[in-house]
Amino acid sequence: MATEPMTNYGYEKLCAELKNLKEVERPRIVVEIDIARSHGDLKENAEYHAAREKQAFIEARINELGLMLANAQVIDPASLPHNKVSFGSSVKILNLDTDKEFVYTLVGSMESNPSKGLISVSSPIAKALMGKSEGDEVSITLPNGENEFEILEVFYKDIVFEG
């Protein structure tokens, strides 16, 4: 698995989720399974089967988070140069076909929130913008087809994930 770039915020958020799953959710589901098991016949015990399914989901998520954290590359976007589009950069682009402007900030895939302008570095838009500078024009394939964009500005701003 390749390294996964993320901010310290993203790393801490994943650590908190992992801790919660291991220390709260996993013990809780073990108790639920024991209670369901005490109700008798396991073949037709929907409560037991639901709890086992939930346990499998929790264990899979614990494994997934463990892998993500093991492969995490924590990056402080403020420490990077932002003369070209890179991780943590904010970029203002102009759709040359529609004359609409957009501002995006490139973050890790686990931190993305497109409605807040936070897009994953692995998204098609981010991939097309990476390494480009102000004034560059890029062609990006979107669901509605090929679109031409001009990069108006590349800058750094503090990334606000919540609130």
UniProtKB/Swiss-Prot annotation:
GO biological process: DNA-templated transcription elongation; regulation of DNA-templated transcription elongation
InterPro entries: GreA/GreB_C_sf (IPR036953), TF_GreA/GreB_CS (IPR018151), Tscrpt_elong_fac_GreA (IPR006359), Tscrpt_elong_fac_GreA/B (IPR028624), Tscrpt_elong_fac_GreA/B_C (IPR001437), Tscrpt_elong_fac_GreA/B_fam (IPR023459), Tscrpt_elong_fac_GreA/B_N (IPR022691), Tscrpt_elong_fac_GreA/B_N_sf (IPR036805)
Keywords on record: Coiled coil, DNA-binding, Transcription, Transcription regulation
GO MF term list: DNA binding; RNA polymerase binding
Entries under SUPFAM superfamilies matching the protein: FKBP-like, GreA transcript cleavage protein, N-terminal domain
Source superkingdom: Bacteria
Coiled coil: 45-65
Key word DNA-binding present: yes
HAMAP family membership: GreA_GreB
Purpose: Necessary for efficient RNA polymerase transcription elongation past template-encoded arresting sites. The arresting sites in DNA have the property of trapping a certain fraction of elongating RNA polymerases that pass through, resulting in locked ternary complexes. Cleavage of the nascent transcript by cleavage factors such as GreA or GreB allows the resumption of elongation from the new 3'terminus. GreA releases sequences of 2 to 3 nucleotides.
Protein family according to the UniProt entry: Belongs to the GreA/GreB family.
Record's protein name: Transcription elongation factor GreA
Species the sequence originates in: Helicobacter hepaticus (strain ATCC 51449 / 3B1)
Taxonomic classification: Bacteria, Pseudomonadati, Campylobacterota, Epsilonproteobacteria, Campylobacterales
